[in-house]
């Protein structure tokens, strides 16, 4: 939506997080939604929401209270008489790379078929043609590009690392976090973060139950004849079609799986006890 601020029209994007069946947190991103106007470090404002009947009362950081209710187009702001005076339209965001087709020569790791499940140790198809978390590819890769799609569950009563947690381990060595981080800051242990190494440039996480994408271009670490590392690994990653790490140097492996080595590595989709699922996983070797 556009609002007036200091005499100028300014775009504001809102993301609403469910914290239970009746409590919510709203973050207003001044400039637009993350990746569509708002950039890390720009202004945000938060409000706490409480549902009573069909009315949500929002209390802002400075104590102001506004009331709203759901309408067909989104969130309707209401006056003291319960009349809708304005509407914040709901936006359904979709990754630019959702449904990307593997190019000729790609290694298709999972396409929903029973045969492709066999490409993974502990591979298991669930909910029809989706790949369950906690599995690793049998094939190993050096320099490569990868596309995959993932979906986190709706867990409104969970918090932090217990909310839709999994992870995509490049070569089984470098974890790119998978988590329901919708509306959060985007830290290195949240969705899109490279665990313990780098936070994403912008938090592009979509709401839980939305299909999301990771696309990366990875160059493995290089070693000399004596097995000494002479060049760190590097990676560029897109989350939902937006670059969140741009030619990032990876100085070391991340915790939880395999150490760095002068050898190809597998794709590991971490199991963390939450029902995260994957689909459309393919690799292009470089």
Regions found by a protein language model. Give the residues of each.
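Carbohydrate-interacting regions of secretory-pathway proteins
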Residues: 10-11, 17-286
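Mature N-terminal, pre-catalytic/accessory segment of carbohydrate-active enzymes
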Residues: 2-12
